[in-house]
Amino acid sequence: MGCVFSTIEDNHIHHINNMMELGGAEISGIKLHAAIDVLIRRNHIHHNTMGIWLDWEAQGARITQNLLHDNDVPEGSIKLEGGMESQDIFIEVGHGPTLIDNNILLSRYCLLYTSDAADEGL
């Protein structure tokens, strides 16, 4: 529960996992478990295999005023069996409200939300 009540702001996060040496879970510009009452704002996040990933038990989190772009699998890369997809924001198994507002999302895929009981993304 180390990130509860945290603020992550004004960072420039880029070029995470571009060599594709790690193709499974846990790879992202910002990756948090149990993001309870966390604020992620005014970050510039680009050229990662995934931008922001809030996993398991996110509630009361807010993602605001961020610029995300080019968060895609690098050109020519081979997708690994069981590897994760790429997008700017991924909310997985959230337990409460998550507010996503006033962001600029410019990657090929901007948002994946898999927190409902049916496990269907938006």
Model-derived regions: residue spans:
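Short glycine/acidic-rich loop motifs that flank beta-strands on beta-rich extracellular proteins
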Residues: 1-7, 13, 17-26, 49-57, ...
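Extended ligand-binding clefts on enzyme/binding-domain cores
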Residues: 30
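Conserved small/polar residues in nucleotide/adenosyl-binding loops
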Residues: 113-118
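N-terminal low-complexity segments that are often proline-rich with Ser/Thr-Pro
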Residues: 120-122
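Solenoid scaffold repeats with emphasis on beta-solenoid/beta-helix
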Residues: 6, 33, 37-38, 60-61, ...
